[in-house]
Amino acid sequence: MSQAYDPSQEGAKMSYAKDMSYGDYLHMDALLATHHPQSDAHDEMLFIIQHQTSELWMRLVLHELRAARALLLAGGDFRPAFKMLTRVARIFDQLNSAWDVLRTMTPSDYTTFRNALGNSSGFQSHQYRLIEYMLGNRNTAMMKVHEHRPELHAMLAAELEQPSLYHVALRALAAKTGASFAPEVYRMDNPHSADAAVQAAWRQVYEDPAKYWDLYELGEKLVDLEDYFRRWRFNHVTTVERVIGFKRGTGGTSGVQYLRRMLEVELFPELWHLRGDL
């Protein structure tokens, strides 16, 4: 019979009474103490962890988007920002895979604890709203949901004072191509809508990638990001429809119909529309 493997025989440290351990570094005790089901239903734990892990990934999305925006604002080498935007796209790919786990919960499973949720709903996520605001979909009506938490409301209001990631990209586009955009293009308190001059400038880039390589790659990184973001939204819709059908959402929205409306939002419309012009 073979002996049980003992890592200490190869020099692995096995005592952490006076040193920081894995659990200490990650604050695992605090992290694992955050799950508080409001019912005895077995599947409520799945529901909680699905949403909590999504919020953790969103925390990283915000971290990467802020850094990418700062780098683009500073000008110079865009490549570090490209890495961050690629990471954001991959995070949404990861979040897409997570829907497959939640889909193991059937409508019957969900009904065992749905009433325990009260009026809490995913559209109340301030981190998701920050992501939307940072990407340029600045629907200020959604801030009302956070009026009961002044610190969150202030955080969202502060974001509206900053240029979105796409605003920053458009400034770089104008600077490097010599294009000029109307002031409305840079408005920070409204969702961005397609602009003919912006589309023409992006077309200039895509018709000569070698000349405008940084802008060309930036455009494609933004398209990648929105592509994965759209898939995440679509998977959200199909998962909700699969679990609750066309019932109203717990937060009072129209549920699936509300989510389908979100599928129509274009974050970087000119980058999609120009493809038909090439």
From Swiss-Prot:
GO MF entry, a single one: metal ion binding
Q: Where does substrate bind?
A: 47-51, 110, 114, 250
Question: Could you tell me the gene encoding this protein?
Answer: kynA
Q: What is this protein called?
A: Tryptophan 2,3-dioxygenase
Keywords in alphabetical order: Dioxygenase, Heme, Iron, Metal-binding, Oxidoreductase, Plasmid, Tryptophan catabolism
CC cofactor note: Binds 1 heme group per subunit.
Q: Which SUPFAM superfamilies match?
A: Indolic compounds 2,3-dioxygenase-like (SSF140959)
Instruction: Outline the subunit composition.
Output: Homotetramer.
**Keyword Transcription regulation recorded:** no
Q: Which InterPro entries match?
A: Trp/Indoleamine_2_3_dOase-like, Trp_2_3_dOase
